[in-house]
Design a protein with these regions (language model features):
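Phosphopantetheine carrier-protein modules
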Residues: 12-31, 48-59
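Two-component histidine kinase catalytic core, primarily the HATPase_c
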Residues: 36
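Thiotemplate assembly-line natural product biosynthesis machinery
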Residues: 1-19, 72-79
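C-terminal structural segments of small proteins and small subunits
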Residues: 51-78
Length: 79
């Protein structure tokens, strides 16, 4: 799941040839913007069947936080 997420995330930000780390603050990437945010939310729903609300999303800092949130939501039924 982690590899799929990172691959999809890199595609969203057009960073396929760049190295990223789970500890990275994803909001600090140069191409992070509102369109990337919407694309990420859509990808998490389509690929992993989870929905993360805005207030919850604001608390997520790193790529690892995103992965942990997806895993927690999958256990909790997606919502």
């Amino acid at each position: 799941m982690e590899k799929k997420f990172l691959t999809d995330f890199k595609e969203i930000l057009e960073m396929e040839n760049e190295e990223i780390h789970l500890s990275d603050n994803f909001r600090e990437y140069e191409k992070w913007d509102s369109l990337a945010y919407l694309s990420l939310i859509a990808m998490m729903d389509e690929e992993f069947g989870v929905q993360i609300e805005g207030n919850e999303f604001k608390k997520l800092i790193t790529l690892n936080d995103l992965i942990n949130a997806i895993n927690a939501k999958k256990i909790d039924g997606g919502n």
